């Protein structure tokens, strides 16, 4: 139950780009007291640009559509996440925790740090990512981009087949380390 002193000052903030898998579009909305909304609007107008018109139109159409699609997408994301977590944790030298949000997995590569690939030492997440891309054509984001050295970020916002093929190539890459 809400304290009486908070009534009238509550805010509702909703993200549409994540809920409807509009990756990178950064669109949502907020509802609340006029004074706070004006302050947020002022800050936002000086800090970032506005959402593009295509993203705004897509968000509007998504809100007007059947919400069952969100439930269906969530189920697909969960299936991909669970399959990827299981596969990653079966690869010697790699591990991950089951993510609770978004559609990214932080791949722990510390178990392969110090090993070599074609004579090059895996001394950072950047090196791991570069070699993986160059030789196996799998793109991951090195953890140093998130101040998470020793990790690489994987996305499961693609088809299950793409996720599993990427992991097959990562496993092949890791098996070739010396």
Task: Locate each region found by the language model.
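PLP-dependent class I/II
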Residues: 9-178
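Single conserved hydrophobic/aromatic residue that forms the stacking wall/gate
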Residues: 1-10
């Amino acid at each position: 139950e809400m304290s009486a002193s908070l009534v009238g000052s509550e805010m509702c903030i909703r993200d549409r780009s994540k809920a409807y898998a509009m990756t990178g579009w950064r669109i949502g909305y907020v509802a609340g007291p006029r004074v706070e909304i004006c302050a947020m609007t002022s800050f936002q107008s000086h800090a970032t640009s506005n959402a593009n018109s295509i993203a705004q139109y897509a968000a509007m159409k998504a809100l007007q559509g059947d919400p069952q699609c969100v439930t269906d997408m969530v189920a697909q994301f969960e299936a991909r996440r669970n399959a990827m977590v299981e596969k990653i944790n079966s690869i010697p030298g790699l591990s991950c925790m089951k993510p609770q949000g978004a559609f990214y997995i932080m791949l722990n590569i510390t178990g392969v740090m110090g090993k070599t690939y074609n004579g090059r030492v895996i001394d950072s997440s950047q090196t791991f990512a570069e070699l993986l891309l160059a030789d196996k054509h799998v793109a991951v984001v090195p953890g140093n981009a998130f101040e998470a050295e020793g990790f690489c970020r994987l996305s499961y916002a693609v088809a299950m087949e793409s996720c599993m093929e990427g992991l097959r190539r990562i496993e092949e890459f890791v098996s070739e380390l010396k």
